[in-house]
Each structure stands twice: as C-alpha cells, then as structure tokens.
C-alpha cells in the first residue's frame, strides 16, 4: 500500500546534498591517505578532494543518524481483509563493508505476511536503506532488516533475501568479479511452515 508520504522514486529522498562543514582533522586525515598512496594532495586536481570525500562518506553512512524502526510507526488497518503475502522485489541498495570500507552493491527482496495491518510500501525500502547506509556485513544487514520488520509490524512471517557483490572481493584480494553473495532470514511461518516458505521463495524467484 502506498501512502501520501511515499515518494515517486520508491522512497528515496531526492535533492541536492547540503555542503556540510568538514572538521579540519577529517580533511587532514584524507590528505594523509592521499600522500600515503603516493600522490600529492596539493596538486590542482586533488585540492578539493578531501572535502568531497568527507562529505561523500557522511552521505554513504547517513544511516547512523536515523532509527529505521521509526519508518514502521504508521500502519494501515483497513486493507479490505487482505491477509496474503506482501512482497517487494529487487530493491536496489548500496552499502560499504566494515572490513575494507569497499562498496557492497546489490538488491533485496523483502516480504511479510500481515496479521492485522500493513505498512506503506516505501517504508520497507527505507528500513533497508537505514541499515545499509552504515558500515556493514551482509549477514548482519539481512538480520537487522528482518528483525526490524518483525518487531515493528508483528506479522505472521517475515522473509528477507539479499543478493550483492562485494568490492572487497571483486577489486582486491582474490579479484574475482561477477560473484554474488546471497543471504536470507526467515521468521515466523516462513521459517516454521514449509509450504509458506516455498510460496514466498517462489514469489521471490528462488523457489
């Protein structure tokens, strides 16, 4: 179900990013990193890079500034008796791994089986992004999203499946591109009832 606060782009806020102030010690840390790589932070092309990088990372990790559970505060009880699976497939997201701070790029499938109320569809994506925009590991991200929906909506079941590629594997270390990692968390009937589990996995496209 959509609500009046759902944005046309599926829940993402659109607009220019404000130029937040960057503390001197943060900018200097990035200058130090540039020097360590072998480049000169004082050359023309890199003069503004420390500020850009600092602001970019503040944006990449803006999930720390919010409680994703708040997106589930508003629910709808008048749903015409609907009591079947609600599923959002292929929600794109970006995160960064906590080990190398390398990009994690993927998509999530989020489903729940409502008990007596539903939530606006963009709110599921907002929960995902609230946790993804932090330093993460995919396993924890999957669990956090599922647990948040389970605790916030008290549905009969929750299923979260995440598929992602990891920069720490594709561009460093074993340098193996094209590898996708899949994680899942099933709760309630999707964990305990084989028929319900098969149904939701089939809808996701993994049955």
Description of each model-found segment:
Residues 1-207:
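A domain-level signal for the structural core that forms small-molecule/cofactor-binding pockets
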């Amino acid at each position: 179900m959509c609500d009046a606060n759902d944005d046309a782009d599926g829940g993402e806020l659109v607009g220019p990013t404000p130029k937040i102030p960057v503390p001197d010690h943060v900018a200097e840390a990035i200058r130090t990193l540039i020097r360590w790589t072998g480049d000169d932070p004082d050359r023309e092309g890199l003069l503004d890079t420390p500020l850009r990088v600092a602001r970019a990372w503040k944006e990449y990790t803006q999930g720390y500034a919010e409680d994703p559970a708040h997106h589930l505060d508003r629910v709808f009880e008048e749903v015409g008796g609907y009591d079947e699976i609600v599923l959002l497939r292929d929600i794109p997201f970006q995160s960064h791994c906590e080990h190398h701070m390398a990009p994690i790029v993927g998509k999530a499938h989020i489903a729940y089986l409502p008990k007596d109320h539903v939530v606006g569809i963009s709110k599921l994506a907002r929960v995902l992004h609230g946790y993804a925009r932090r330093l993460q590991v995919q396993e924890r991200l999957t669990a956090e999203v599922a647990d948040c929906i389970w605790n916030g909506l008290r549905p009969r079941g929750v299923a979260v499946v995440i598929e992602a590629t990891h920069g720490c594997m594709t561009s460093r270390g074993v340098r193996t591109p094209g590898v996708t990692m899949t994680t899942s968390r099933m709760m309630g009937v999707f964990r305990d009832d084989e028929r319900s589990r098969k149904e939701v996995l089939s809808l996701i496209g993994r049955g």
